[in-house]
């Protein structure tokens, strides 16, 4: 009798150990790095009391497991999810830009979908010669673990404006899907400036005012040599990409609308990626303190983007804003024509 109990106990410990390892591997594969997200704490349960922050990743894991099961339930009942199915896949979709257009927000929101797995950091494989020289296998090993049915997505906004990138991505996968999130060009340029300004101030360095950078003092015209201005000429960059990819492989996300009405934009992306609709209004809630939408995984696990998001922009001379919008207008019209999406920017 004692021998049977010992055997039973060893078997039970083996099963529990396997479950613990499995949970850890799945957590790494699906939840990924939380470095750019900040938990809302304390999180109150509907049953009362605040949950320990250390419990939150496990609760999120349990919720996402349920979503993954829902996504896979159309398969044969004989098919099971096994840990050995986990692989590091090359991305099937890439958010290629635009810087300060909302790339991080888009990636984190898409990660709500059970069929999406995100690369937690910007890889900078295609825009960095040193990284690119390491080869495609190095790039693949930078990807998170996922199941074959899932889509791995990475984002590196520098891809959009870097000349060599379209050809390099084409050589990897000529049928890849490309996401471009854009904002009103002048607003985006000011946001770009604001991020650089904040970095200078942290180092106690002085920096020119936006007006002096955006307007050429010699000609009083828009300074197209200023990177923040050049980046906002979306059509110039897109034309370079269209030499390698048809327009059907691009999806334009309205970054301004993603801030105010994220769900319709996310539903369009789901359709573009041929994903079943899984993201709902339940997954998104407006945080009045931060002034933008945050993510809800379940009733106790909520996340907001890091505090660096939603920076307050400096006041800019209205005449400069008018001049910039007049400058961008013809480029915007061409962008609408090429993409088939009118964004009604001023």
Curated annotation (Swiss-Prot):
List of residues binding substrate: 122-128, 155-158, 226-227
Membrane topology: Single-pass type II membrane protein
Residue intervals on the Cytoplasmic side: 1-12
Annotated GO biological process: heparan sulfate proteoglycan biosynthetic process; negative regulation of coagulation; regulation of viral entry into host cell
Catalytic activity of the protein: alpha-D-glucosaminyl-[heparan sulfate](n) + 3'-phosphoadenylyl sulfate = 3-sulfo-alpha-D-glucosaminyl-[heparan sulfate](n) + adenosine 3',5'-bisphosphate + H(+)
Function summary: Sulfotransferase that utilizes 3'-phospho-5'-adenylyl sulfate (PAPS) to catalyze the transfer of a sulfo group to position 3 of glucosamine residues in heparan. Catalyzes the rate limiting step in the biosynthesis of heparan sulfate (HSact). This modification is a crucial step in the biosynthesis of anticoagulant heparan sulfate as it completes the structure of the antithrombin pentasaccharide binding site. Also generates GlcUA-GlcNS or IdoUA-GlcNS and IdoUA2S-GlcNH2.
Family: Belongs to the sulfotransferase 1 family.
Protein name, per record: Heparan sulfate glucosamine 3-O-sulfotransferase 5
Native source organism of the sequence: Mus musculus (Mouse)
Organismal lineage: Eukaryota, Metazoa, Chordata, Craniata, Vertebrata
């Amino acid at each position: 009798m004692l021998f049977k109990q010992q055997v039973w106990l060893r078997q039970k410990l083996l099963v529990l150990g396997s479950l613990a390892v499995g949970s850890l591997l799945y957590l790494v594969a699906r939840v990924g790095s939380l470095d750019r997200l900040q938990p809302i704490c304390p999180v109150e349960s509907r049953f009362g009391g605040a949950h320990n922050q250390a419990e939150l990743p496990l609760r999120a894991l349990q919720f996402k497991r349920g979503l993954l099961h829902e996504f896979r339930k159309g398969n044969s009942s004989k098919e099971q999810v096994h840990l050995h199915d986990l692989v590091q896949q090359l991305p099937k979709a890439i958010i290629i830009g635009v810087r300060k257009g909302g790339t991080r927000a888009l990636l984190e929101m898409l990660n709500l979908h059970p069929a999406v797995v995100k690369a937690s950091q910007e890889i900078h494989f295609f825009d960095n010669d040193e990284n690119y020289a390491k080869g495609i296998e190095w790039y693949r090993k930078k990807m998170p673990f996922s199941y074959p049915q899932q889509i791995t997505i990475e984002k590196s906004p520098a891809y959009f404006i870097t000349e060599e990138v379209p050809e390099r991505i084409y050589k990897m996968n000529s049928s890849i899907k490309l996401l471009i999130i854009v904002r009103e060009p002048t607003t985006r340029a000011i946001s770009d400036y604001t991020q650089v300004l904040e970095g200078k101030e942290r180092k106690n360095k002085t920096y020119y005012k936006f007006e002096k950078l955006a307007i050429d003092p010699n000609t009083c015209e828009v300074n197209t040599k200023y990177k923040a201005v050049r980046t906002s000429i979306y059509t110039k960059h897109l034309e370079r990409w269209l030499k390698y990819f048809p327009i059907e492989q691009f999806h334009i996300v309205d970054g301004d609308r993603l801030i105010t009405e994220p769900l319709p934009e996310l539903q369009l992306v789901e359709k573009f990626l041929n994903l079943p609709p899984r993201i709902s209004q339940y997954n998104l809630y407006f945080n009045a303190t931060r002034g933008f939408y945050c993510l809800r995984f379940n009733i106790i696990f909520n996340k907001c983007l890091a505090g660096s998001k939603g920076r307050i922009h400096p006041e800019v001379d209205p005449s400069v804003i008018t001049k910039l919008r007049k400058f961008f207008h013809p480029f915007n019209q061409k962008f609408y024509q090429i993409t088939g999406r009118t964004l009604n920017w001023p």
